[in-house]
Amino acid sequence: MPNDIAVLLPVDRPAGALIDCAAAVAGLFEAHLDGIACAYQALNPMIAFEASAVVMAAQYETGQEQAAVVLDQFEITARRLNIPHDAKSTFNVSYAATRTVTEMSRLYDLNIVAQPDSSNPSQTDFLAEAILFGSGRPMLMIP
């Protein structure tokens, strides 16, 4: 029976259904739920060195704002359902993101992620595959 559940929340597409499902699973098992908003920087600063400072700062602020919105939505749902929870955000460059997410997912009894949608590509489409093959922990994929 899972005691600690993580839901990895995409910041660049709607996460309401994912949050609702994760809250329902956590409520079913009376588990602690961590909402982790994953914002990623697509630009590699070593490729576009001249413009990297300005672009990276803009991407960072946009990613943090999007993460804050998703985490607020998560907190409202978890409080409404009386689920013990924490909310976190992670912001990383794309080449280190897989390692970061995999290491974080190893700490939980169950990881809940959104299923990638090929008709609507997202920056976080790699999450499901990274957790499935890298964490060694159970994963629930929500369409």
Language-model segment annotations:
Residues 55-69:
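A short acidic, glycine-rich active-site loop
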Residues 11, 87-93, 117-120:
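Short, flexible loop segments at the rims of nucleotide/cofactor-binding pockets, characterized by
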